[in-house]
Amino acid sequence: MAKNRKTPDMNLPMWFDGQNINEALFCEEFLQERRIIFANGAFFTPDGRVTDDLPLRGEIYDKLKFCAVNNIPRKITNILEVLKLEAQVSDFPPEQDRIHVANGTLLLNGTFTEGRPAIVRSRLPVGYNPDAPAPVIWLNFLDGLLYAEDIPTLQEFIGYCLIPSNKGQRMMVIKGNGGEGKSQIGAVLSTIFGTNMKDGSIGKISENRFARADLEHILLCVDDDMRMEALRQTNYVKSIVTAQGKMDLERKGKQSYQGWMFARLLAFSNGDLQALYDRSDGFYRRQLVLTTKEKPVGRADDPDLAEKMKAEAEGIFLWAFEGLQRLVANNFKFTESDRIRENREAVKRDNNNIFDFIDSEGYIQRKADASISSKDFYEIYRMWCEENSLAPLKARSFSDAMIANAKKFNLEHCNNITNSAGRRVWGFMGVEAIARPHINGFYGDSPCTYVPEDIPEEWRQVE
């Protein structure tokens, strides 16, 4: 064995000549004693990814402390850099068909293998115990927090987060008015996921191009108190939710690289996740929006509830695994109640008032053989917004939103519409104007001041 290799003249390891340490020989011996690899910018062991290298430095120090060499901390740093080269493998793909837990490996078909012989990407701190009691406190908590038909969706989503896969292509937002206890879910999940879960901010992910790299190797990112501001850009968030394989990641001051991304996003909020400019169906389609029940008046909250539920971790894991198996059997299509679908539609409508405008009466009507120019269509829309005290979209945003939803509204966007001046312009087939802003009274700034006729004569006199 390498650990018994000694110099012929002194009772010293081969990597130490009495004065100097040979880092390459040290790493060669270290790797024969320790199962560890370096891939995708991180060390991995049978315990999963090394998130804190202090214990690793401690192991190296234990081997070096008998050596009378100067500046051991710097020497340890040098050894770690050499170890990255010595232990490097070209790639370490995630295993999507199994869950590595504290006491072994659980396959999606329910087969369990005890022991931890292999180096793995991630290992959950919870153990697999098929005889674990049902998590009664957890289930009672969910029953008081969520509507019964929405609980299976949460069960499937938590189970979905157990494996490194984004095949479901969904994120989850749990919305309430505050005080319901929804953030207790995050505290319980931290016991199940350990270092494979990260507290983060969806707002930061959307704004900061470096934030995605912080989610590399992570199974679940929890935003415990999502900001209410609408996202200025959504491409970073959407790319994480739909990532299937490697994606371009960037860290500050370093060149971008291709890294594995399979982090799922879970947010708790008092409002909806909205986009400032993105009104595409794709942004909202990827959200599972659960609403909480109202907090009962006079309910006494248990300050130790989270700790009690954490004690049921093994049972909660079995409950989540059941949800994962159901999701996989359904080809990664989540169970969605009518309420969840209505929530998603409401979020979309709140952020894009063209849906309410299209359904309004007295302004337009959908008619197969009718047409309207884009300019007139927008002017009627502005009129509707002003009369309903709503902020109108800009002309380009309105047109883009109408084009994106043309099929849903049975409209056709084309450039052979004839306007009132007889010129051919862009517009829409399938809709007819009822209200005409330039005819039906004042719209926008009035061109003159209206003076009633029944005012006293002396008020009309000018000094």
Locate the predicted segments by residue.
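Loop/turn-to-beta-strand initiation segments
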Residues: 217-220, 261-265
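Conserved nucleotide-sensing/catalytic segment adjacent to the nucleotide-binding pocket
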Residues: 211-254
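Replication-associated primase and helicase/ATPase modules
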Residues: 1-34, 44, 49-52, 107, ...
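P-loop NTPase catalytic core of nucleic-acid-dependent motor ATPases
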Residues: 31-56, 99-100, 105-219, 288-291, ...
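Alpha-helical scaffold elements adjacent to nucleotide-binding pockets in ATP/GTP-utilizing enzyme cores
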Residues: 59, 63, 185-188, 218, ...
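Intein modules and their embedded homing endonuclease domains
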Residues: 2-128, 260, 393
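Positively charged interface segments
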Residues: 32, 77, 193-195, 200-209, ...
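Phosphate-handling catalytic cores of nucleic-acid transaction enzymes
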Residues: 310-352
